Amino acid sequence: MKPQIEVVVGDITTMEVDVIVNAANPSLMGGGGVDGAIHRAAGPQLLEACKTVRQQQGECAPGHAVITIAGDLPAKAVIHAVGPVWQGGENHEARTLQDAYLNCLRLAAANGYKTLAFPAISTGVYGYPKAAAAEIAVDTVSEFLTRKPLPERVYFVCYDEENAQLYQRLLIQRGLTPDA
């Protein structure tokens, strides 16, 4: 069966899915971009949950992910994934980004979540080239979904049409659109 992957232009904090992914920083304490938006929309409970995780485990290393409550968000949970900072591509950034996506998918599956929404991890202040990051995201997610029953559906939530078109083109090229 073909993986169920959709591209959406919009605000990830309003997605009515089981779990959303936060492009977090290692401190898990919120920040700019999507990280700050998710923390603001979720309310103080999310920061408290992140503080607890940090006290138990320390910082979250690049490529890793942790799961928390969602606070005031419509989602049931938030998976905080730390992607790599782009350093030119010679420091295992691609592998680290792939690991971040895989660890999110594994956490969602382990918790029985059927629907998952991803932002474009590492493409903001971390500077990962958007096209290369989209390719890693689409390939990693589609490969995982063909081998595992959960999650059943994944959304790539893009903040603008330009980014969404990158993902949509990749889905078409790989025959992953519903009509392909």
Swiss-Prot record:
Its EC number is 3.1.1.106. Pfam families: Macro (PF01661). SMART domains: A1pp. Substrate binds at residues 11-12, 25, 33-35, 122-126. The active site is at 35 (proton acceptor). The keyword Hydrolase applies. GO terms for molecular function: O-acetyl-ADP-ribose deacetylase activity; purine nucleoside binding; ribonuclease inhibitor activity. Belongs to the MacroD-type family. YmdB subfamily. NCBIfam families: PRK00431.1-1, PRK00431.1-6. This is O-acetyl-ADP-ribose deacetylase. It comes from Enterobacter sp. (strain 638). The gene is ymdB.
